[in-house]
């Protein structure tokens, strides 16, 4: 798992889009990009599966966790899952998302999928369960 962090307006979304596009060049499996807006859909290479969670009515952490697990379960060829704004999508501060981070760690281990996430916070404000994945 990789965390792209920083206060709002520090280029996290551009960094995750660039990361997804770069991952596609070396990926042997599928690359998926999850966010809650269509704003950046055309910044991603067309081969990346773009999912706007707003279209699926996700409104909380449990729904997001189920959505992510469903994506992994539906296709064993998924290699990368990029999530822009996980706390915003889950509707909670990142400090309250330990269970979804634990679920993603388990998915990485069990299904060899790699997660890349953006979190709007300074490094010193990241909870330990997030900070251990931040560079």
Question: Language-model segments: what does each one mean?
Answer:
Residues 24, 72-73, 105-108:
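N-terminal cationic-hydrophobic initiation segments that often serve targeting/anchoring roles
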Residues 2-4, 31, 79-83, 115:
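Generic beta-sheet signal
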Residues 1-70, 126-128:
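Conserved P-loop
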Residues 71-78, 98-99:
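N-terminal targeting/trafficking signals and adjacent low-complexity tails
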Residues 12, 60, 64-67, 82-86, ...:
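Amphipathic alpha-helical interface surfaces
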Residues 27-28, 44-46, 75-77, 109-112:
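Short loop/turn elements that form and flank the Walker-type P-loop nucleotide-binding site
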């Amino acid at each position: 798992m990789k965390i792209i962090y920083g206060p709002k307006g520090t280029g996290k979304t551009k960094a995750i889009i660039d990361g997804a596009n770069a991952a596609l060049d070396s990926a042997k499996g599928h690359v998926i990009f999850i966010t809650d807006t269509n704003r950046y859909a055309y910044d991603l290479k067309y081969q990346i599966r773009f999912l706007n969670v707003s279209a699926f009515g996700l409104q909380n952490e449990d729904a997001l966790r189920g959505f992510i697990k469903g994506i992994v379960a539906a296709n064993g060829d998924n290699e990368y899952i990029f999530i822009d704004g996980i706390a915003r999508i889950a509707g909670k501060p990142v400090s309250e998302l330990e269970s979804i981070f634990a679920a993603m760690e388990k998915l990485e281990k069990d299904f060899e999928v790699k997660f890349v996430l953006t979190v709007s916070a300074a490094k010193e404000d990241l909870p330990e369960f997030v900070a251990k994945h931040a560079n």
